[in-house]
């Protein structure tokens, strides 16, 4: 009987340890916004602990801010940049053209993209060695220094 109680206690402790470890690295998100020069930018970071696992950017650009008059002109202007994002593992990019604005959605999956490919992304900036991952804390500092504001949940 004593052995059964010890076995149950050990099993309970093991289950609790597994549950604590599973809960300790819960994915969370932070969102930042910036409106500047006719472009509204919304960045959403998904992270575990201090390590960013995914970043999604949604940029809404009026055609006037791009210096073009029409949807067709915007498509011509943005195509070359958009083409640079295609075919990179861990990166998805698309542009939706409306009557008066373009909406670009860019998603970077840091669990899939290589550090070499990450350095090829136009407009991507980072501090330090990205081969070890992207720090949420450092990303937040960098964004706030550039004028981004965190959106409260």
From Swiss-Prot:
Primary location group: membrane
Amino acid composition bias (Polar residues), ranges on this chain: 124-133
TM region positions: none
GO CC terms, sorted: plasma membrane
Domain of life according to the entry: Bacteria
Signal sequence range: 1-22
Residues with a covalently attached lipid (N-palmitoyl cysteine): 23
Family per record: To E.coli YehR.
Listed name of the protein: Uncharacterized lipoprotein Lmo0207
Source species taxonomy: Bacteria, Bacillati, Bacillota, Bacilli, Bacillales
């Amino acid at each position: 009987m004593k052995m059964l109680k010890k076995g149950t206690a050990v099993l309970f402790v093991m289950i609790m340890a597994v549950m604590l470890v599973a809960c300790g690295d819960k994915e969370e998100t932070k969102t930042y916004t910036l409106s500047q020069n006719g472009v509204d930018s919304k960045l959403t970071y998904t992270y575990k602990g201090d390590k960013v696992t995914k970043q999604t950017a949604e940029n809404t650009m009026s055609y006037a801010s791009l210096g073009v008059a029409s949807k067709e002109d915007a498509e011509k202007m943005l195509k070359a940049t958009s083409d640079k994002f295609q075919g990179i593992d861990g990166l998805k990019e698309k542009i939706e053209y409306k009557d008066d604005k373009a909406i670009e959605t860019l998603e970077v999956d840091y669990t899939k993209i290589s550090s070499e490919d990450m350095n090829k992304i136009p407009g991507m900036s980072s501090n330090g060695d990205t081969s070890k991952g992207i720090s949420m804390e450092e990303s937040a500092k960098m964004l706030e220094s550039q004028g981004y504001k965190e959106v409260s949940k």
